[in-house]
Amino acid sequence: MGLFSSTQPPQPTTVPSDEIIPLHFWNTALCMRGTVLDVSLKFDDVLDVSKLRDALNRLLEMEDWRQLGARLRMNVDGKLEYHIPAHFDASRPAFSMTNAQHETSIADHPLGARIPHTTGTPAIFPSPDELSPLLRSADAPKHIDDWTYSDRPQLCIHVITFSDATVITITWLHTLADVMGMTTILNAWTALLQGNREAIPKLQGFRSDPLTQLGQRTPAEKYMHFNRVFGRKEFLWFIGLNIFDRLWYRQEERRTICIPATCLRSLRQQASSEISATSSSEGGTVPFVSESDVLLGWWVRSLYGALGLRTDQTILVNNALNLRTSLHESFMSKDSAYMGNALCMSPTFLQGQQIADEPLGQIALRIRESVAEQRTPEQVEAMTALQMQTMEKTGYLALVGDPRMMLLSCSNWHKARLFDMDFSPAVLQSSAQSSSQNTQKKGKPSYVNGVQHSENSFRNVLSVIGKDAGRNWWLTGVLRTDAWAHVEEQVHKLGSS
């Protein structure tokens, strides 16, 4: 190699028969390009790998579903595009599926034994990243280059089988889909396993772009927080302060939290009582808050202490708003499903003094009401227009608020219902027992592991993974290492209250 030679191999040669489709603008944001997702579903059953492969093969041969077998390329203009093979075969399969077989029980495997499980009490587990050597194949992709400089299909699946359990790990680049988009794939996959082809919707795939149309209906200036959008100066100031924080607190950890059903029930009752007391004094009806609202309120209050936030500080709680469930007409078709990323961030502004003084119920209600305000058709359209304008200029999603604020983000995967995925037709033998002590159902995941691979930090990001068959809630958060001690205290308090 010469001094100025690139060590990057050339992209594979374009196959003339491939159909080439540019990626939707919305899917090309830098944060999408830079994030690879792993979702692992752990079953207390032995699944038939050949049935899994056959059903997915049949799905990706169906009409628009074939698009999911596309290859990702970067064209000469630096734009991402999909190359969809005219047909799939052994040399160019629609997806990658590998299988690691272990003859022992999962409990006897060094890493398998460390997969989190419910204990009946609130618990914090080590980083889900530590399970990656078991849950992903040795050559599983971690970077966009692993797709663009190979002929790798979009979906990479690794199945790990034990004598009494199975884990399915799906790996994909965020440009393909968000978690709700992956749920669309999983639902269609399981429908074919069950022989229910009629339940599979048409795919609003790579050729359809409702988000761009959505962003052209209402001016960005109509967005309720438009006057707080970061300009270049505010953005650089915010980034600089966050870089300083990461230099000062260099170590960070991703941890998994399990909150038992009984604890969350008590927490929600507490929140409802607090809201009721305020509403009664004001003579109004008692507003509703969901379990997810209460969980996020509890998390925000916990981080107020864990991060040492000030009473005069602005705290921005950024909720990922799923546009598919925003009830907007662009996504209301019962016969088709949108594939891709369909997210906007819905900010709730809080002051440190509010978090210090107000009860849990009031914080949860503030978050819920703020999100509801931003779910109207006009606000969804204005938010989308703002994000498109910002991405065109910078490649990044828009930020609003104060450069000195503390940003806490939340992505609610519970809406994807990952614990409800029914793979029972592929069960060969089951160790899942339904009883008064064990509510686990055959062919449904008992645990879901979520990991993001990125050069960017996910510090102060919470993922609400979902609620298992026993109604226990699972969360994954990334915090600077020293903050976890305070969060552990708050988790243990839930068990003693």
UniProtKB/Swiss-Prot annotation:
- Please provide the record's keywords in A-Z order: Acyltransferase, Transferase
In terms of Pfam families, this protein maps to: Transferase
> What Gene3D superfamilies is this protein classified in?
Chloramphenicol acetyltransferase-like domain (3.30.559.10)
| GO molecular function terms noted in the UniProt entry | acyltransferase activity
Q: Per the record's keyword annotation, is Kinase included, yes or no?
A: no
Instruction: Spell out the subunit comment.
Output: Monomer.
Protein name, please?
A: Acetyltransferase adrJ
